[in-house]
Amino acid sequence: MKVACIGAGPGGLFFATLLKRSRPDAEVVVFERNRPDDTFGFGVVFSDATLDAIDAADPVLSEALEKHGRHWDDIEVRVHGERERVGGMGMAAVVRKTLLSLLQERARAEGVQMRFQDEVRDPAELDDFDLVVVCDGANSRFRTLFADDFGPTAEVASAKFIWFGTTYMFDGLTFVHQDGPHGVFAAHAYPISDSLSTFIVETDADSWARAGLDAFDPATPLGMSDEKTKSYLEDLFRAQIDGHPLVGNNSRWANFATRRARSWRSGKWVLLGDAAHTAHFSVGSGTKMAMEDAVALAETLGEASRSVPEALDLYEERRRPKVERIQNSARPSLSWWEHFGRYVRSFDAPTQFAFHFLTRSIPRGKLAVRDAAYVDRVDGWWLRHHEAGPLKTPFRVGPYRLPTRRVTVGDDLLTGTDGTGIPMVPFSGQPFGAGVWIDAPDTEEGLPLALDQVRETAEAGVLLVGVRGGTALTRVLVAEEARLAHSLPAAIVGAYDDDTATTLVLSGRADLVGGTK
């Protein structure tokens, strides 16, 4: 059996090693256009709870993290000059170049042929191989060549991001939110060695343009960094990194693209890692996902009784649902980062801002499992400003008073637990009553219409909007438009348990939470 891997990233190297180990008679060749020590990017980060499948196949990653990486338990959120910390997160990171070096050693020891500075330009060059694994990254050329079969799609985020390192040593995963003269910028930062931290910066397109950071020529040769942006961000974040410099490595602005493919295989060609799928870096490690792909593909191919087509079908059958779950869970987090400037400016209390951030993908209860003391502090903050806990706090608007934040919903009435009701009418563009229903869209493409309806409702002087229909994410985005852009109270209607309802109110996403009669 002859197997070619296009790309010597972690996924490709790990797959080649595992396959060669399980099938020593196979000829496994890795083609890589760059040199062995060429590495773009800085560190790779992993959650402690997600490494079991990789470790079971080969402990190389755990060994790299233990011997060469950095480990931490807390996440820190910096905003408005204050710092909020939450524990129980259990994460580790290592320099990408170090991990690649160890993976190259493993592959070499198993007898994998690694051909560096050897770029495959024509698929015909690999005609004599029985299997070709395409692991050439998110911008995969071969995925594009076989686009009719793979059916690739990309959802491009509106936010801009750029990847740097810094010699300032963060002590764990830290999110730094900085309001500057041109807009709000935020950094995802974490240590990757004893002398370097990763420093990823995001901002919205308008702030990026106002700061004059749109002048970098994307045709600049690979490897060169955007020095103007580097200087700007060093100055903007100077106090946060104690004047330390940023370190560039092919650092240039981009928009994150969530990539999917209708099929992961085309004949003997199969996609692996970022070539097949991506998930926003705020919740998913592309390296981890690629290495898990490698484990699954090597396992299905390792059984001699199974043909290559059967193995590829089983690989996709096993991995696709797991990957899609990660991508789906990443969407609320990606959306948060597309709107974080609004949140920085809307939430004056660092406690509520941090809780809003930390619950973008999980509810209060799951956060409490990780750090009960932190959630107790958030609850205490609420109690200092209100009469009772989030769901037990009375709600007042105009002449109406409801005893709690839980309501029952009908077509023309929003009813409190004591039977008190707020009259509701559907949005119609005509004069409104006390409250107006806004129907959230089923997809984010429909949000502009719903947000326009919120604006018209606010301008008409109504007391409250109720948001129903749509998805959990679009309902929240419509409600936040009302609350944060127009200071208009919002009720969200859905099948919410008390934990999720508490999270919505405590985080400032909604004022009332209801279910239908």
Curated annotation (Swiss-Prot):
One of its GO terms (biological process) is catabolic process. The keyword Zinc-finger does not apply. GO terms for molecular function: FAD binding; oxidoreductase activity, acting on paired donors, with incorporation or reduction of molecular oxygen, NAD(P)H as one donor, and incorporation of one atom of oxygen. Signal peptide: none annotated. Keywords: Aromatic hydrocarbons catabolism, NAD, Oxidoreductase. InterPro entries: FAD-bd, FAD/NAD-bd_sf, PheA/TfdB_FAD_monoxygenase. Disruption phenotype: Cells lacking this gene are unable to degrade salicylate. It catalyses: 2-hydroxybenzoyl-CoA + NADH + O2 + H(+) = 2,5-dihydroxybenzoyl-CoA + NAD(+) + H2O. Pfam families: FAD_binding_3. Its EC number is 1.14.13.209. Belongs to the aromatic-ring hydroxylase family. KMO subfamily. Involved in the degradation of salicylate via a pathway involving coenzyme A derivative. Catalyzes the aromatic hydroxylation of salicylyl-CoA to yield gentisyl-CoA. This is Salicyloyl-CoA 5-hydroxylase. The lineage of its organism: Bacteria, Bacillati, Actinomycetota, Actinomycetes, Kitasatosporales. The gene is sdgC.
